[in-house]
Regions:
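Solvent-exposed interaction patches of small proteins and small membrane subunits
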Residues: 1-102
Length: 102
């Protein structure tokens, strides 16, 4: 299977959009965030979106490299083992996968 650059470019655009939405709506303090449930929902939803997009990218890259992850977290672990992803980032993403499932 060949790497689909168009898919990756689209996913990276979606990731940028999710991060941008979080950045543009980020409150100046934790107190302001805690006081605004709509803002909390927007931030959480875009964090979930960003994590899911990263999972999609990692799964695509793993599959393109003949890896067969059984879970979302395994995709990051396998990419790190192949030297395609920093180990610390892989560990953080595995934790983020768990956050997404909360």
């Amino acid at each position: 299977m060949n790497l689909n650059r168009d898919v990756l470019i689209a996913k990276l655009g979606q990731l940028h959009d999710a991060i941008d939405r979080i950045e543009t709506k980020r409150p100046r303090s934790l107190e302001l965030l805690l006081a605004d449930r709509d803002l909390q929902d927007m931030v959480c939803k875009n964090i979930e979106r960003a994590v899911q997009i990263c999972i999609d990218i990692a799964t695509h890259l793993a599959t393109m490299n003949a890896l067969a992850p059984k879970t979302s977290g395994e995709s990051f672990k396998m990419l790190a083992a192949k030297g395609m992803l920093d180990t610390e980032l892989a560990t953080a993403m595995i934790r983020a996968v768990g956050f997404r499932n909360v």
